[in-house]
Amino acid sequence: MNQAFICDAIRTPFGRYGGALSSVRADDLAAIPLRALMARNPNVDWQAVTDVLYGCVNQAGEDNRNVAHMASLLAGLPHQVPGATINRLCGSGMDALGTAARAIRAGEARLMIAGGVESMSRAPFVMPKAESGFARNPQIFDTTIGWRFINPVMKAMYGVDAMPETAENVATDYKIEREAQDRMALASQLKAVAAQKSGALAEEITPVSIPQKKGEAIVVDKDEHPRETSLEKLAQLKGVVRPDGTVTAGNASGVNDGACAILLADEATAKLHGLTPRARVVGMATAGVPPRVMGIGPAPATEKVLALTGLKLAQMDVIELTEAFAAQGIAVLRLLGLQDDDPRVNPNGGAIALGHPLGASGARLVTTATNQLHRTGGRYALCTMCIGVGQGIAVVIERV
């Protein structure tokens, strides 16, 4: 069986909602890391790419009509290279990576690009068509995040809790204290700022030039979301679901814009194109959980991928766990028997600080983990995420 290797990975900075990247179309944003991959690897015959797989969650606006292939064409990849867009909600970018690796291991592909994109700032409003000629009270939905066009049967069967509500459910069911959530949020911010200062995050970012109506273009070269805070400031924030709730804007991930791309190949193809393998994709697994507590999804997904690969959690030198909400992050750690402040977890900050552009986040976790393994000399990394409507996804990679 062939092995799938990550040979290069790059992302844009992650922009705040309405921030520096908000003027960039989603398809153009998706093309930026692809273009960077091409520039960084001049010896590759890009027509040899079997497929481009990109995760994207919204797909209701400028990311419509298969944004993976649109981005491929916009980036300048040969038109012979196909592309497909994957939607497993928040796990989309990670699913794209795992699916690409599976194709290589199966011998059906030799050179693949995987990644993801999300422009939450540019998510459109949508409305359904009238069911009759004189229909009244049309609904309008903001597609930025969450439910739209709700199926009443689904609502009756499982409920349609908003994402912050699912986090409150997790906090209640698993007794996750408010102070513990705020401590995780503060740690995420502090680690992210330290990683920015040390240059650790800069290794994985390609700068984005934003044209201005007047004057020179603005160059964005770092994530916009990290911010200074303290436990005292975090404790003053009110709950977003209810005033006495524990989930706040301070201990939840951001609404963000960004894109990420990863180049994968088997060993022979990497050598043929002058590429250096950096990490082997060992395996991927997904799992389902009740939608009302979707945030615990990484726990069973992690257990499945470890069973699949024959590895143990103790062997993981780096753990990249998406911080959709601190409540769910802590619940997952405790379900896996880990401490809230395990030093292996998100050593460069997590989504609370760096942001969570949905379709891109999974690819970002794998990119960050690959670089961290090489900085520290670690062998294995676990990357895992929760997924809306009740799923989890996990990938294990090995440094080479």
Where do the protein language model's features map onto the residues?
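Conserved catalytic cysteine-centered active-site region
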Residues: V24, C56-L111, T144-W147, M157-M163, ...
